[in-house]
Structures are given as structure tokens and as C-alpha cells.
Amino acid sequence: MTEKEKMLAGMVYSAVDKQLLEELNAVKEEIHRYNALSPADNDGRLGILKGLLGHIGDEEIIINQPFYCDYGKQISVGRRFFANFHFTVLDEAKVTIGDDCFIGPNVSIYTACHS
């Protein structure tokens, strides 16, 4: 079983696995691009989020910068989603957020279970 398979199964895994580190670094590059965009660039931000997150319910999504996550593809958000500044998701496991959800500033969601 690979370290990624262990991670996705909710088992203790090695966070310094080469494959996982490569994925983390690729996501960090996208997050850096997202956080560097103008807050007024709604189309640019939406485009990055569509490629980064596992599921977006509709285009009524706002995640204020800065935003941080580990993998992105483990995150699913519903329709009419809003997250305020400094939203952090360590998405080593699935994170599902439903419709009409508003998240305040400085909220963090952690799912990591690594050694």
C-alpha cells in the first residue's frame, strides 16, 4: 500500500513520501498564484479554484485570500459558498461542505493523520 493510499484510507502515513511531497508542492504553487491575484479578479480566482478543488457546487463561490490547503482535490463545497480570510484546510481526507455555508475568518479544518 502506498503512502497516498494509506492517507486516503485514514491510516497513519509518512508525510515525507516523495509522491506526496511532489503533489503538495504543485498545490502550493497554485495556492501561491491564487493568493497573489487581485481580490477583484473573480474570474481568475474561480478558474484556479475549479482546477484546485475536488468539487464546486456552482460559480457562487468566494474564498477570500489568503487561502491554504494541502491537496485541494479532497475538498468539496456546495452552492453559494463563502469563506472569509485565512481559511485553511489540511485535506488529507475528504472535506465536504454543503450548500449555503458561510465560514468566518481564521477557520481551520484539519484531517491529517501522519507520522
Give residue spans per PLM region.
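Terminal amphipathic alpha-helical/low-complexity segments used for targeting or macromolecular assembly
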Residues: 1-59
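Flexible, glycine/small-residue-enriched loop-and-beta-strand segment within the central core
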Residues: 53, 67-77, 82-115
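Short cysteine-rich loop/turn motifs with clustered Cys
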Residues: 59-61, 98
